Amino acid sequence: MSATVHYKDIRKGMEKDLESLFKKYDSDRNGKITYIEIVETLRKAGKKNPERIADLLFRDDTDKNGELTIEEAKLRIVRMNDEKIEKVLNWDVEKFINDNDKDGDRKITRDEVLQRFTEQGAEDPELITDSIFRQMDLDRDGVITCDEIKEFNRKKKFSFLKSSAPKQ
């Protein structure tokens, strides 16, 4: 599969994610989301600092009318070239490694992931850890590397809105 096809697939996935985002936040179903709609929805969901997330989304309000349309949000995707998308993918991989690699060896062990979920009070950290390793430890050597994460992202539908990394 060529890199161009891969990035087109990512763009399509991003557009679907945007459509889902609009369905979730457009409380009055007028095809536009307001800053207040985003903040209120995030607050109801128990998110901390909903204004910060709304600020990030509203960078795409190109006409600065206080309403974000799906077309405005899609412009960001169009403006992203393949190089930028690859940079974002690599940043996500780096962030996942940095968030979970406790000993700095650039590999994530099962114990490191298990410790992370246990510290966060996950309901079943063993089950979550096993699931992550079944999917991402491609060579079954007990560690997850940057290359395995990149390969996992290539094979799976990549989503910018659904992080594969544990939440902080």
Curated annotation (Swiss-Prot):
Disulfide bonds, paired cysteine numbers: none
UniProt: Ca(2+) 4 binding residues: D137, D139, D141, E148
Any one GO molecular function term: calcium ion binding
Database matches in InterPro entries: EF-hand-dom_pair, EF_Hand_1_Ca_BS, EF_hand_dom
Annotated residues for binding of Ca(2+) 3: D101, D103, D105, K107, E112
List of residues binding Ca(2+) 2: D61, D63, N65, E67, E72
Residues annotated as binding Ca(2+) 1: D26, D28, N30, K32, E37
Residue span, EF-hand domain: 13-48, 48-83, 88-123, 124-159
This protein's UniProt keywords: Calcium, Metal-binding, Repeat
Stored Pfam families: EF-hand_5, EF-hand_7
Top-rank lineage group of the source organism: Eukaryota
Function: Not known; probably binds four calcium ions.
Descriptive protein name: Calcium-binding protein 2
Organism listed in the record: Dictyostelium discoideum (Social amoeba)
